[in-house]
A protein has these predicted regions:
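Cysteine-nucleophile amide-bond enzymes
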Residues: 2-247
Length: 247
């Protein structure tokens, strides 16, 4: 009896551990977090030259951690005046080149990732931030793209190479290129992200305020996913209660 009881307990423990593993595996594969890819085209000379060469609508790519694009990173010029003083930067859509050029056209893409991938993205970006002074712009890599030959140098990136590198290192499956060959157009034609806005960058936050609800903390709620479903459920309950009170 004791042996049978012990065997049953062992089976229960094994079954419990198996269920926990299944739950953890499901959590690791569920895409519950978002990052954002901003594709843009300003009226600067480098942007116009790139557009003329590529014949593509966008010449620059950035990676953001929030829908308002408040925390956003890329490789670009560090100041407004000197186009050759470039490196890893934190971008602001209301300052710098974006703030100066109110006619900047853009495309905002939302990419759902797993919690584990999101954690890795944050870790990679933190490394970039800590070593910011080491990074330069991969000018030679741009010519490599023209020749279809990836030129990847440590601490040197161009904008779309940087975005691809971060996502790729975090385990996000993309379009099977080397980071040194990634172009803004690749993100535009990639079918994984959702298009949430296309138009003038200057009007983007106004668009958000008119089309996205906010939670009690003043943060925009995604229009798909668990948070938005919960928001809609809460709104439905409130509407039912209001209707009942009026009857």
């Amino acid at each position: 009896m004791v042996l049978d009881g012990g065997f049953q307990m062992s089976n229960k423990n094994a079954s419990s551990k198996k269920n926990i593993r299944k739950i953890n595996q499901k959590k690791n594969t569920e895409k519950t977090k978002c990052v954002y890819i901003l594709l843009s085209k300003t009226s600067t000379i480098p942007s116009r030259v790139i557009k003329m060469w590529t014949k593509e609508p966008y010449a620059h790519a950035s990676l953001a951690l929030d829908i308002e694009l408040e925390e956003m990173y890329s490789f670009a010029r560090k100041g407004v005046k000197n186009p050759f003083n470039c490196g890893f930067i934190s971008e602001d859509i209301e300052k710098g080149i974006f703030g100066r050029d109110v006619e900047t056209r853009c495309r905002v893409l939302r990419l759902w990732v797993t919690a584990n991938q999101h954690k890795k993205i944050l870790k990679i970006l933190n490394k970039f931030k800590k070593e910011k002074s080491f990074y330069g712009y991969n000018y030679i890599g741009i010519f490599g793209v023209i020749c279809n030959k990836a030129v990847e140098r440590r601490y040197n990136y161009f904008c779309s190479q940087f975005v691809y590198y971060v996502l790729d290192r975090a385990g996000v499956r993309m379009f099977g290129k080397k980071p040194g060959l990634a172009r803004p157009e690749d993100f535009r034609t990639w079918d994984e992200p959702e298009l949430i806005y296309e138009g003038k960058l200057h009007d983007y936050r106004k668009y958000l305020s008119e089309n996205y609800p906010k939670d009690e903390n003043g943060k925009y709620i995604e229009k798909t996913g668990v948070n938005y479903d919960l928001y809609n459920k809460k709104e439905t309950i409130l509407n039912i209660e209001t209707a009942a009170a009026l009857m």
